[in-house]
């Protein structure tokens, strides 16, 4: 990262949330690529987590952990962000009971209201950029997003960007050519400029 700062100058603080000299969008992508190297197995279960920055064991995860971990690499803690926001603004969240810091940040239905407030929603016809976060619909007969991933910097056989994700049982974290067949319902990007408080 030192050479990047020397060549380009350090990015403004609002474009480098964690102060590591890497702009936010690239930092999210780097976090996602690290996950591909780690190859966490798809394991869906409820666990008691530390707080803040709690995580399941690195050897396992679900699709939402892709976003949690990639964003953490750029300085965002979705666990505390979503938990504290849901406590402050419960009407914005589809809570079934009191907010739960062990699981809420790992649920797409809880990510969506948080992302709408804190990240940039990208229009469907805008070009995909590496580091974009996508919420997808893998079950067309069941309304709503049920899968999540990060847009890669590599193209698949379709010519479209691959998606870093943890697909389902029997899979490990990796890049897949999902865009030709799995509808993207929502796309978000980490902010490159400061956003006003909601």
PLM regions with names:
Residues 1, 25, 64-66, 138, ...:
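Residue-identity detector for threonine
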Residues 1-4, 198:
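Low-complexity, Gly/Pro
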Residues 4-114:
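N-terminal capping segments
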Residues 22, 87-169:
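...with weaker cross-activation on analogous glycine-rich loops/strands in unrelated enzymes
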Residues 51, 119-120, 193:
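Short linear sequence elements within intrinsically disordered, low-complexity coil regions
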Residues 78-79, 151, 182-184:
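A structural signal for short, hydrophobic beta-strand segments that form beta-sheets
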Residues 158-198:
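Low-complexity, Gly/Ser/Thr/Pro-rich intrinsically disordered linker/tail segments
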């Amino acid at each position: 990262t030192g050479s990047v700062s020397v060549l380009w100058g350090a990015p403004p603080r609002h474009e480098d949330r964690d102060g590591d000299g890497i702009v936010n969008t690239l930092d999210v992508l780097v976090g996602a690529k690290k996950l591909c190297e780690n190859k966490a197995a798809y394991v869906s279960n409820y666990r008691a987590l530390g707080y803040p920055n709690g995580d399941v064991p690195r050897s396992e995860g679900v699709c939402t952990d892709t976003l949690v971990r990639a964003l953490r690499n750029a300085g965002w803690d979705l666990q505390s962000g979503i938990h504290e926001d849901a406590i402050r603004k419960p009407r914005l969240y589809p809570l079934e009971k009191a907010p739960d810091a062990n699981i809420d940040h790992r649920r797409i239905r809880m990510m969506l209201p948080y992302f709408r407030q804190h990240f940039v929603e990208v229009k469907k016809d805008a070009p995909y950029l590496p580091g974009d976060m996508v919420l997808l619909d893998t079950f067309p007969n069941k309304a709503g997003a049920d899968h999540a991933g990060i847009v890669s910097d590599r193209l698949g056989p379709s010519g479209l960007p691959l998606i870093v994700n943890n697909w389902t049982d029997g899979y490990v974290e990796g890049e897949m050519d999902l865009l030709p067949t799995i509808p993207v319902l929502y796309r978000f990007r980490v902010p490159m400029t400061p956003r006003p408080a909601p």
